[in-house]
Curated annotation (Swiss-Prot):
<dbReference type="GO" id="GO:0030258">
    <property type="term" value="P:lipid modification"/>
</dbReference>
<feature type="transmembrane region" description="Helical">
    <location>
        <begin position="358"/>
        <end position="378"/>
    </location>
</feature>
<feature type="transmembrane region" description="Helical">
    <location>
        <begin position="232"/>
        <end position="252"/>
    </location>
</feature>
<feature type="transmembrane region" description="Helical">
    <location>
        <begin position="403"/>
        <end position="422"/>
    </location>
</feature>
<keyword id="KW-1133">Transmembrane helix</keyword>
<comment type="function">
    <text>Protein-serine O-palmitoleoyltransferase that acts as a key regulator of the Wnt signaling pathway by mediating the attachment of palmitoleate, a 16-carbon monounsaturated fatty acid (C16:1(9Z)), to Wnt proteins. Serine palmitoleoylation of WNT proteins is required for efficient binding to frizzled receptors.</text>
</comment>
<feature type="transmembrane region" description="Helical">
    <location>
        <begin position="475"/>
        <end position="495"/>
    </location>
</feature>
<protein>
    <recommendedName>
        <fullName>Protein-serine O-palmitoleoyltransferase porcupine</fullName>
        <ecNumber>2.3.1.250</ecNumber>
    </recommendedName>
</protein>
<feature type="transmembrane region" description="Helical">
    <location>
        <begin position="46"/>
        <end position="66"/>
    </location>
</feature>
<keyword id="KW-0808">Transferase</keyword>
<dbReference type="GO" id="GO:0016055">
    <property type="term" value="P:Wnt signaling pathway"/>
</dbReference>
<dbReference type="GO" id="GO:0005789">
    <property type="term" value="C:endoplasmic reticulum membrane"/>
</dbReference>
<feature type="transmembrane region" description="Helical">
    <location>
        <begin position="434"/>
        <end position="454"/>
    </location>
</feature>
<dbReference type="GO" id="GO:0016020">
    <property type="term" value="C:membrane"/>
</dbReference>
<keyword id="KW-0472">Membrane</keyword>
<dbReference type="GO" id="GO:0005783">
    <property type="term" value="C:endoplasmic reticulum"/>
</dbReference>
<dbReference type="Pfam" id="PF03062">
    <property type="entry name" value="MBOAT"/>
</dbReference>
Amino acid sequence: MDYYYDDYYDEYYDHPDQAAARLFHRDLSIEETIKNCVHPSLRFATQYITNFIAINLLFSVLVLIVRKLFPTAQRSLHLLSCVCGAALVYRVIDHGFYHFLQLAVSLYAVQWTLHRWLTGTGRYIKTPFIVIAYGIGNLLVSELLEPSPETWNRIRGTQMILLMKALSLAFDTDDNHSLRSQLTVLSYSGYILCPANIVLGPWISFNDYLTIWKPPAGIEPKQCRSSSGRRMLIHVFRIVTSALMAVGFLLTSNCMIDYLLAPINSWKWVRAYGRALSFRTSHYFIGYLSQCSMMAAAADWHRAEDERSIMLPVSSLYRITSPMAVEFPRSLVQVVTAWNIPMHLWLKRYIFRTTKRPFGTGTAIALTYIISSLLHGLHYRLWITLLTIGSWTFVEHEVRKKLATIYSACVLVGKCPSSCTVHQHKSNSVFCTVINMLFFALNIFNLIYLGCIFESSEGPPDEVQQDKSMFGPWTELNYASHWLLVFAYLFYFVI
């Protein structure tokens, strides 16, 4: 349930000239579309992406140089991270620095106080949960006190990444005294300000951040030198490919969807499909840009195992989103997992697993939904959307589980192996194909319905408007998915 949050980032690239371009009349020719939309978007994308690539490549090179000259001076990593991260924030975010600063400083102060005074005591509430309560409370109060919604919209994603880092740090250092001993003001600052993910994410753990300094093991120096040229070319290819993918999704979101759907946009479901697809492709833009940023900052790009995949290193740190899994979903569970992979892992590791043992599965799922929603701030549309997604995910899982049991068929949420011995009807049978295709169509329908409420061109959501305008796209579609959800829930009890 780590969903729709990337409309926050659209303020980064939705400049006035681009916003005007996206609102152009749908009868523009291809030449006018290129002139009024593609060119402004390309100019901005070039400037914006260059900041990420240049600063992170500089960070990577400096880490390699300093690590070679001073192999034991790990504090150099933190200093470089602080300087490069601050430079990137200064280049791409022009408002709201004080929100970031006060949240980062206060979260460290809270953790330091709790570690100093509560360590070893028989406390009923663990330190990380106190940090969660404080961090989310600080985030919500800051949003309420910020007079400019536009300013908050520019830093919302950065604040969320900062909070996720600090909360994971609270969990990781709660019982790991060895890791806690490495946590100083300088190392904390370097982790929080790491240029690879300070602005757009993704979240990485404190341990993952520290491995930037460690040289790759298992590679002989001569072997490393002999193949370093090839590996460098692969590394550059990956960075360029990710950047081009990001630009492609940005142009698709800003320009091409409107142009291609213009002849048939009089039908409300086509308009809803266009809005939802524009939103999803804007998310893919952010995902591939953050992937590009992470790879540009990878000081250990020459690891031998990275050659197994030319598009992405083996490490899951670099895989942010999977458009194919989202656009062609077997189930909504697959969409939830593939939408934002690092955030899904964060919620699973630190919220769901931590609360499942003491409170049970049901409570753990509810708490995961609540934390996921609150991390995004006061975004009521998103809260309702996440609740709808969670409800659909549960109903789909239970219905398919019942159908698989009754008919002994491979129609579960997860795909059965080709040599499945549990079910009589295999995945390639006619019955299973029909059932799975019906759920595929249902999930495509839900992607349209749930995504159309977010428009990447609308800027920050105006949550003070009446519910009718807030959920206008759903009203236009007669709340079809919600009625279908009720029917599916009743069907679950009937079968």
